Amino acid sequence: SIAFSRAVFSEFLATLLFVFFGLGSALNWPSTVPIPTVLQISMAFGLAIGTLVQTLGHISGAHINPAVTVACLVGCHVSFLRATFYVAAQLLGAVAGAALLHKLTPEDIRG
């Protein structure tokens, strides 16, 4: 159905954005004199997850993590089919987010 497809795409997009912004916050850009601290990086991850849950949570539940999806499957909160598609979308979203960050980041910044 359309709602199921939207939910799967929502998981893909949320995971892509979470990985992109989270990992992007840990890069050492030349304009930042000191390297990002653990607190700054964790704040970026926290703000990213909070924002994504608020914006996409009503569509799919915003699991954004295969471990959360598997836990929901074990707890009988989602069907096996939904969990399978969610995990696949999350894995693809994570790879796509990292690949996008890799392509958009200058080579000397990547480390």
Curated annotation (Swiss-Prot):
Motif (NPA 1): 65-67
Gene3D superfamilies named among the record's database cross-references: Glycerol uptake facilitator protein (1.20.1080.10)
Catalysis: reaction(s): H2O(in) = H2O(out); glycerol(in) = glycerol(out)
Keyword terms of this UniProt record: Cell membrane, Cytoplasmic vesicle, Glycoprotein, Golgi apparatus, Membrane, Phosphoprotein, Transmembrane, Transmembrane helix, Transport
Membrane topology: Multi-pass membrane protein
UniProt keyword Ribonucleoprotein present: no
Mod. after translation: Serine phosphorylation is necessary and sufficient for expression at the apical membrane. Endocytosis is not phosphorylation-dependent.
Segments on the Cytoplasmic face: 1-6, 57-61, 72-82
Intramembrane region residues: 62-71
Disulfide bonds: none
Family annotation (InterPro entries): Aquaporin-like, Aquaporin_transptr, MIP, MIP_CS
Record-linked Pfam families: MIP
Keyword GTP-binding applies: no
Superkingdom field: Eukaryota
GO terms of biological process kind: protein homotetramerization; water transport
Coiled coil: none
Record text about domains: Aquaporins contain two tandem repeats each containing three membrane-spanning domains and a pore-forming loop with the signature motif Asn-Pro-Ala (NPA).
Family under the similarity heading: Belongs to the MIP/aquaporin (TC 1.A.8) family.
Protein name, as recorded: Aquaporin-2
